Amino acid sequence: IDNTVAKLTGEWISSTHTSGYVSRGYLHDNNSEKGNKSITYRAIISEGGQFDVQVSYPFGPNRSKNTPVTVMHADGEQKVFIDQTKPPKILNTFVSLGIFRFEKSERDAVQITTEGTSNYVIADAVRLLRVEETKENTTSSESKNAGKKIVSKSVIEEAEREVERCK
């Protein structure tokens, strides 16, 4: 889900200055009006289930170290803080926020805010990867994702088709 289809609150600046973004660029908060800006990505899914929620951002030394990201899912809300000065671990583009259950609902969303941040907050893209239960590793307690397998087909492809239909 690209920033171009997300709902913005406050003034965000479009940029392509730092590489590592998805699609045509990313947004930043111009390091101003802290606490008054947010960007909400509505989760577009064809059916409910478990999803690995991932956020992308071009990292850099002048980025926020405590960017709040709230995942609004079927079981409530979960706030996660990400350090945008560090490179994302997935393909050097995405960082996982965790696995959450979503239903096909208007409420399902991911929101990045500037509340309590210093330096630049970056908003690029969000993707949801469907997760299926497997019988392997179900007894392992070392990983919160034990017994789960991330399916290679990304829900982002479906969302991109939906965006194209809306244009």
Where in this protein do the model-derived segments appear?
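Extracellular carbohydrate recognition and processing domains
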Residues: 74-105
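Extracellular carbohydrate-recognition regions
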Residues: 1-11, 135-144, 150, 155, ...
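Extracellular beta-strand elements of beta-rich domains used
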Residues: 6, 97, 126-128
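Short beta-strands within extracellular/lumenal beta-sheet-rich domains
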Residues: 24-46
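Short, surface-exposed beta-strand/strand-loop-strand elements in extracellular ectodomains
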Residues: 59-79
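A short beta-strand element within beta-rich, extracytoplasmic domains
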Residues: 39, 43-61
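Edge beta-strands of jelly-roll/beta-sandwich modules across compartments, strongly enriched
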Residues: 118-128
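Short beta-strand-plus-loop segments that form exposed binding edges in beta-rich domains
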Residues: 110-120
